[in-house]
Regions:
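Extreme N-terminal basic, low-complexity initiation segments
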Residues: 2-8
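Divalent metal-dependent phosphate-bond-processing catalytic cores, especially two-metal-ion Mg2+/Mn2+ enzymes
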Residues: 7, 14-15, 19-32, 47-73, ...
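Active-site flanking loop/helix segments enriched in acidic
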Residues: 27, 31-62, 88-106
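An active-site-proximal "capping" alpha-helix that borders the catalytic cofactor pocket
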Residues: 61-64, 108-123
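Secondary-structure capping and boundary motifs in well-ordered enzyme cores
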Residues: 69, 74, 105-109
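His-Asp-centered metal-binding catalytic motifs of divalent-metal-dependent phosphohydrolases/nucleases
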Residues: 74-98, 113, 117, 133-144, ...
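Inter-helical turn/loop segments and adjacent helix faces that build the functional surface
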Residues: 123-129, 173
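Short, structured loop/turn "capping" segments at alpha-beta junctions
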Residues: 128-132, 146-147
Length: 244
């Protein structure tokens, strides 16, 4: 990646997000994902996906990747931040697969995401072909792993799902998209597919909390939760909560 990359991003300060909860009041979420190490290209990627309901999940995936692999490459950090990009754009594979481990769905989702990400990077001045290739490879493998950083990305995706998306599986149950047993199965799948041993240690408490919520899904308040999850400026602490 060239030093002359001409994308500006505001400086942010802070550390990892605090414990996950369902509160949707903006002040409690302000700046949870601040990171002074975020690059201009990463910030540009967030702008590209502005309003995507998975932005919190993507930010948390990047955090988990860096926690699992402190020497994470720039390619891994960016891939973590864009791995589900295709869901932002209409026309993708169904978001209601009958099985969460269905390779046909997982590969279609991963390939489509990689294509969108590669096209995005192709338009950015200063991004080298090798960087694009490595990011594409990681996005292609984010559901199945394969190689050290791909395994880290898969585990980071799982940990982030368990941490930040229980509200989504509760929403599935509340809206009738999936029965509670299927929602629980999604969390179980995300937990058990992880390879790094330390990821399982981090994941078990998150899994137990998510299952506990699903057992009482009808009573879980979700007002405003999707909006918070879609607002990267709020999550990075880049603007006041009065603007929400």
């Amino acid at each position: 990646l060239d030093d002359e990359l001409t994308i500006s991003a505001p400086a942010v300060n802070g550390g990892p997000a605090d414990d996950y909860d369902n509160r949707a009041d903006p002040p409690s979420w302000f700046g949870r994902y601040r990171d002074p190490a975020m690059t201009p290209l990463e910030f540009k990627a967030l702008e590209w996906l502005d309003g995507f309901y998975e932005l919190e999940h993507l930010l948390a995936t990047r955090q988990w990747a860096m926690k699992l692999r402190p020497q994470a490459s720039p390619e891994l950090c960016l891939a973590a931040l864009v791995h589900d990009a295709e869901r932002y754009f209409p026309g993708g594979p169904t978001n209601t697969p009958s099985r969460f481990d269905d390779p046909s769905y997982l590969f279609a989702h991963s390939i489509r995401s990689a294509e969108f990400v590669d096209s995005f990077l192709a338009e950015i001045p200063g991004v080298h072909d090798e960087f694009r290739y490595q990011v594409r490879c990681l996005v292609l493998r984010h559901e199945v792993g394969g190689g050290t950083e791909a395994d880290v990305l898969q585990a980071a995706d799982s940990l982030s799902f368990l941490e930040t998306l229980p509200w989504l599986t509760v929403e599935w149950v509340q809206t009738g998209r999936y029965p509670v047993e299927m929602a629980m199965a999604k969390h179980h799948y995300m937990l058990t597919r992880m390879r790094p041993a330390e990821a399982m240690e981090y994941g078990l408490p998150l899994y137990e909390q998510a299952i506990s919520q699903l057992k009482n899904a009808a009573a879980v308040p979700l007002d405003g939760r999707r909006q918070v999850a879609s607002d990267f400026r709020l999550l990075l602490g880049l603007r006041g909560t009065d603007d929400v």
